[in-house]
Design a protein with these regions (language model features):
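Nucleotidyltransferase catalytic core that binds NTPs
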Residues: 1-162
Length: 162
């Protein structure tokens, strides 16, 4: 597996399928995204990418509110490699990234990673003030011509657990 810091300037030209999320701990919901990105990449001859944060977003917004991470980035990388992920990108959550609009973020992904498929959870939020959501992604997939996969919540005993 290739591990990248997003500050690198490489642009990927192969067809890529990307799972987005904070992946602060790898629970059942995260595993469903990872399985789907791997499956779609293999089925379509592309590469699987997990795009996540180096630091938890709440650590920038309010350090006292930042959750304790269940895995550090090295453990996360080892686990994702065992899951068959081709490329892991770590994004520093900083002021510049935080102020990116939802559309700017998707344009960045399209231009940088040649995205053919985007995999997110049912409650995925992104962009400035979390203004982007799965409904916006449904609109943007038409404009930017990528497949969108929204994973359903994982339930146990009828209750959403992730």
């Amino acid at each position: 597996m290739i591990i990248k810091d997003i500050y690198g300037k490489d642009i990927l030209t192969s067809d890529n399928y990307i799972a987005l999320g904070s992946f602060d701990g790898l629970h059942l919901g995260h595993l469903s995204l990872i399985h789907k990105v791997h499956e779609e990449a293999q089925k379509n001859g592309g590469r699987s990418i997990v795009y996540t944060f180096k630091n938890h977003p709440r650590a920038l917004l309010n350090k006292d509110d930042a959750p304790k991470l269940l895995m550090d980035n090295n453990e996360k990388a080892e686990f994702l490699e065992k899951c068959g992920v081709d490329i892991l990108y770590f994004q520093e959550f900083n002021k510049e990234f935080m102020e990116m609009t939802p559309k700017e973020f998707i344009e960045f992904l399209i231009n940088r990673f040649n995205i053919k498929g985007l995999i997110v959870g049912f409650n995925y939020k992104f962009g400035y003030k979390n203004m982007g959501d799965t409904e916006l992604l449904k609109e943007l997939q038409k404009e930017y011509n990528f497949k969108l996969f929204i994973m359903e919540p994982c339930k146990y005993d009828g209750k959403v657990i992730s």
